[in-house]
Amino acid sequence: MKYPLVPLVNELTFSFLVFWLCLPVALLLFLLIIWLRFLLSQDSEENDSDVCLDWEPWSKNPDEFCQEEMLHSQEEERPCC
């Protein structure tokens, strides 16, 4: 017996199978998007006060920043009496 007596996929069952096979994938994708949006909104609410970036070095020229770093390193090397 080469072929089944009743074919699984034909004109009548194709749309039914596509619907029931794609529905779980679509629902999982939808729930994943909702869950990620919830996590991202929760993270931004909790950590608003924790974020403290020092933008001053980025606003300076690289030469000024390097000179300032050299001054700080020289101050640290000097022993305090």
Curated annotation (Swiss-Prot):
The gene is ADIG. Plays a role in stimulating adipocyte differentiation and development. Induction: Up-regulated during adipose differentiation of four different kinds of preadipocytes prepared from subcutaneous, perirenal, mesenteric and parametrial adipose tissues. Keywords: Membrane, Nucleus, Transmembrane, Transmembrane helix. The chain crosses the membrane at residues 16-36. PANTHER family: ADIPOGENIN (PTHR38499:SF1). Its main location: membrane. This is Adipogenin. It comes from the Eukaryota.
